[in-house]
């Protein structure tokens, strides 16, 4: 019985270490992509070719912010003692939907539905920032 208790106390620790190492690797990968995206943006700004559309540059900037938000989420995970704050997921969702609307705005109906989804996420963000749901220190 004591051996089972010891094993059940070690397993969560090993899983947390594995999760943390995986998140660190994902974080470094995202930093590499963030640097690459920043290089692409600055290259387009200073050496803008006439063939490069500002539309694609806007896509690159929004992708940059998605990388940035995921990195901030991982940093916040470690700062808040292994807890993912809900509001960071909502920020990422809002940014991703905005990027999608900018990239694919061919249908007015889908744009309206996606705008409604953003409105719902903003309402969820408002609720997440109330004292009832706030867990961050």
Curated annotation (Swiss-Prot):
* Chief subcellular location: membrane
Record-linked InterPro entries: P_starv_induced_PsiE, P_starv_induced_PsiE-like
Q: Where in the cell is it found?
A: Cell membrane
Going by the UniProt record, its keywords in alphabetical order are: Cell membrane, Membrane, Transmembrane, Transmembrane helix
One Gene Ontology BP term is: cellular response to phosphate starvation
Query: Which Pfam family would be a valid example here?
Result: PsiE
Transmembrane segments annotated in the record for this chain: 13-33, 55-75, 82-102, 108-128
**Which Gene Ontology cellular-component terms appear in the entry?**
plasma membrane
The record gives the membrane topology as: Multi-pass membrane protein
Family stated for the protein in its record? Belongs to the PsiE family.
Entry protein name: Protein PsiE homolog
Q: Which organism is it from?
A: Listeria monocytogenes serotype 4a (strain HCC23)
What is the taxonomic lineage of the source species?
Answer: Bacteria, Bacillati, Bacillota, Bacilli, Bacillales
């Amino acid at each position: 019985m004591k051996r089972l208790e010891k094993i059940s106390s070690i397993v969560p620790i090993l899983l947390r270490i594995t999760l943390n190492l995986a998140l660190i690797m994902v974080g470094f990968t995202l930093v590499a992509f963030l640097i690459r995206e920043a290089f692409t943006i600055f290259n387009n700004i200073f050496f803008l070719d006439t063939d490069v559309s500002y539309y694609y540059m806007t896509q690159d900037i929004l992708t940059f912010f998605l990388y940035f938000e995921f990195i901030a989420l991982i940093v916040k995970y470690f700062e808040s003692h292994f807890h993912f704050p809900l509001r960071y997921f909502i920020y990422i969702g809002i940014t991703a939907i905005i990027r999608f609307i900018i990239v694919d705005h061919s249908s007015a109906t889908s744009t309206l539905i996606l705008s409604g989804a953003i409105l719902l996420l903003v309402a969820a963000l408002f609720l997440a920032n109330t004292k009832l749901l706030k867990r961050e220190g």
